[in-house]
Amino acid sequence: MMKNTIDNEKKWKVLSSEYLFRRPWLTARKDVVQLPDGRVNPEYYILEYPDWVNVIALTKDGRMILGRQYRPGLGNTCYEIPCGVIEEGETPLEAAKRELLEETGYAGGDWREWMTLSPNPSTSTNLTHSFLVTGVEKISGQHLDATEDIEVSLHPQEYVLELLQNNQILQALMAAPLWKYFYGLK
């Protein structure tokens, strides 16, 4: 087993924090921080987000479930794996199961925690928890949030790998667990 290399040896000291704005999905703050060598940075900006989940979901016949939806940050419609925010009081697994059902109508199967990533450890406080589930079945229609418009489709795994290799799955926090899946790090 690999030794844990993440530690607090060079931890910065937060001298003060000022919240610039707070919204349900994003909070921004300005910290005054002291570095280990004693230098002070009077303006270090941190984005506080809730933790997220995403799901690599395979049907009983081995096809992958993808969604396509418009993403305003890129100004494009993108392929994605099911994903969403962990609601207060939920575990990552509970959130992953809920998001898969809400976005696709699929449920069940054998669930496995796949990987956990930081979107940007330099400026963001949250983590993304990825799951792999095999053997899911369609049990209902979608139950989308007001701003969601997700086109769900099932694809052979080879096609999803081709999408990934050709930069058609752009979200890094979705691409990383897919690369892990396809390159045998199961």
Segments from the language model and where they lie:
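Extreme N-terminal tail/first-helix region
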Residues: 1-22
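Short beta-strand micro-motifs in enzyme catalytic cores
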Residues: 27-31, 77, 127-129, 151
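Acidic, metal-coordinating catalytic segment for phosphate/diphosphate chemistry
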Residues: 16-54, 60
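Hydrophobic residues on conserved beta-strands that form the core of alpha/beta folds
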Residues: 14, 28, 41-43, 67, ...
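Unchanged
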Residues: 42, 52-54, 59, 85-173
